[in-house]
């Protein structure tokens, strides 16, 4: 196993839209899958959610981790990990970031999966599940990555 370079870590983040978000709730770590978009211009991870356990936890403790992997086989994979700070967005900034998220994910799906998606509900059901979406970003403080290949 070897460490990934910064540019390789950013490539893993740029080329994917599904990852895992880790946060603390009542002293215990929780890890859940998320749909995300890596914004290299702002060095942030953008996502959204609705009211509930996850958002309550991140509002109380804003230290989070996002992990993303590309797995070809048990002996051939790359993993990127981002440590950062949760920040809830509102108003025009939230709208702009949600637009960036939607367009960014659509672009990745077009490139990687060779299919067209027109609406957010084609790759994420959260928007229509419970109320108004809560847009947030993870300000990246530290990154790390590993690679295994044979």
Positions of predicted regions on the chain:
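Beta-strand-connecting loop/turn residues
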Residues: 41-43, 62, 141
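Helix-adjacent hinge/juxtasegments
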Residues: 54-89
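Short, basic/aromatic recognition patches
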Residues: 1-20
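Charged, gly/pro-rich active-site loop segments
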Residues: 78-150
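Structural motif corresponding to alpha-helix initiation and N-cap regions
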Residues: 6, 51-52
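Short, structured patches in soluble enzyme cores that scaffold and shape functional sites
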Residues: 25, 68-70, 139-142
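Short beta-strand segments
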Residues: 16-50, 66-67
């Amino acid at each position: 196993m070897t460490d990934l370079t910064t540019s390789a870590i950013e490539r893993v983040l740029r080329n994917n839209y599904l990852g895992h978000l880790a946060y603390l709730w009542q002293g215990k770590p929780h890890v859940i899958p998320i749909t995300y978009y890596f914004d290299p211009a702002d060095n942030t991870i953008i996502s959204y959610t609705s009211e509930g356990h996850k958002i309550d936890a991140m509002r109380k403790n804003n230290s989070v981790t996002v992990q993303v992997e590309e797995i070809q086989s048990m002996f051939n994979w790359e993993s990127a990990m981002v440590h950062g700070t949760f920040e809830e967005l509102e108003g025009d900034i939230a709208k702009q970031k949600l637009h960036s998220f939607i367009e960014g994910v659509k672009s990745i799906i077009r490139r990687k999966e060779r299919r067209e998606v027109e609406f957010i509900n084609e790759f994420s059901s959260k928007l229509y599940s419970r109320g108004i979406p809560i847009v947030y970003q993870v300000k990246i403080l530290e990154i790390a990555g590993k690679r295994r290949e044979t």
